[in-house]
Amino acid sequence: QLPPKHEVRTVWLTTIGGLDWPHSYAQSKNSIAKQQAELCTLLDQYAKAGINTVLIQTRIRGTVIYPSAYEPWDGCLSGFPGTSPGYDALKFAIDECHKRGMELHAWVVTLPMGKWNKLGCRKLHAKYPGLIKKIGPDGYMDPENPRTATYLADICEEITRNYDVDGIHLDYIRYPETWKMRVSASRGRQNITSIVRNIHDKVKRLKPWVKMSCSPIGKFDDLSRYWSHGWNAYTKVCQDAQGWLRDGLMDELFPMMYFRNDQFFPFAIDWAEQSHGKIVAPGLGIYFLDPKEGKWNVADVTREMEVLRQYGLGHAFFRGRFFTDNIQGIYDFAKRFNASLALVPPMTWQSASAPNAPTAIEVCSDGLAWEGDTPYYNVYSSRTWPVDTHAAENLIAIRRAAHSLKVNTHDRFFAVTAMDRYGNESRPLQSHEERAQPTAATQMLACDGTWLQLPAKPSTLDADMVACETVEGTVVCTGPYAHRLNVARLAEGTYILRSLNRKGVSHRLGHFQVRRRL
């Protein structure tokens, strides 16, 4: 099963108590550098395993990892709650993720405020006494208090305004399971949805390309043939996550599917069928691979990953340490499973306009450069020309902000696409057009300007039709997979020939040129 070109591959990077990061405190110039170097090492590991989205815990328990006008510093960075570590950890993480072609989403823990006497809970309770409810030793923001929605929206607006985040990721956006419900379930869902809507509106008003996401309970509701065992998003904790996708309040979901077998697969398919064209990347409970946490076998997780890919879903690992510690070889498997780079699916429901293509590509022995006016660029490479930009295996750099790339260019061809903030790609700009014919002779198909000679069909190829497309990827004609194809109506130029079966699966067969003498 070849990796797809578009797929969300995610890690939750937990900062509370330094669970995933940091494992040392920033209290001096040297210790700041050490803390930052540890994060860079983790991000390098993520990138090598094909991860393209990092969810970093930004608001923890009424405390944060950036200088905020609303809430104090968390103690995970400096060792002292309320004390700055001497640098902006959120900005640093964003910059380092972007250098590696990865998105960074600010993970915002919404209602839980931690222990009643801890700094975050204590300060917010002092400022807004009626906003926090005590349940046992812990405090929770009251989902039935309208100020909860506006306060959390202000936090998310602050992050969106001040930082180049790619997403706002809401955690625990639901009623606590220990909450004594005094309203109907329908009213409870309205209360939670009101919080989501307030946050969505403030974020999108500032930057409509910033993705709204959350991590709902892994089972949306009971299914006709499978029971959720009393633990689901919709009925139990008033979390209408599928409705948020339908109504455009969420762009992406990371359901916490920390289950196996018939408690996983039917519910994963339900998320896929109710995605409403948005992005779903179920969270996988890889912490259960640790004997101290559970008794899972790595095959439990790898099978889940394979099925998710079959249904066009992404995957998210909870959490970072269990991933990079390679518990039961899960990191090694992910490197093989994600053997090629992947782009995050475009937000076509927000914007579907393709940006301008890059211009003036120049290739030298140690790299290539191009010109353009869009935020990001993707680079493709292969030994044949034109480079197939539909093939994920040809991706060599993604979400690149720079207009150049250092790479060995010997015996290689390149194509560069521009990409806007919504993930829409331009048509490709191909390199080496003048060198293409002699180098790629084995891929050149015979064409006399009227008839194209089709290559013999391999016995293993399931295809009844062929399609001709331009270098930009536009299909211009189709026909049966026979001995030859009439191309008399095609304009002069270079075209790509692809096979096509009834399921829409396509494979590149070669390329050809239409030339006619006057």
Can you say where each PLM-predicted feature lies in the sequence?
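Substrate-binding cleft of secreted/luminal carbohydrate-active enzymes
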Residues: 241-242, 246-264, 278-350
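Active-site-adjacent "subsite" loops/lids of carbohydrate-active enzymes
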Residues: 6-8, 12-37, 95, 105-162
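Pro/Thr/Ser/Gly-rich low-complexity, intrinsically disordered linker/stalk tracts
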Residues: 333-373, 423-437
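Catalytic domains of carbohydrate-active enzymes, especially glycoside hydrolases
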Residues: 34-63, 162-167
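Beta-strand-rich modules
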Residues: 405-425
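Aromatic-lined carbohydrate-recognition surfaces of secreted/lumenal glycan-active proteins
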Residues: 103-115, 169-170, 188-234, 279-289
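Aromatic-lined carbohydrate-binding/catalytic grooves of carbohydrate-active enzymes
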Residues: 49-85
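C-terminal tail/sorting-segment detector
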Residues: 437-441, 447-450, 454-456, 492-518
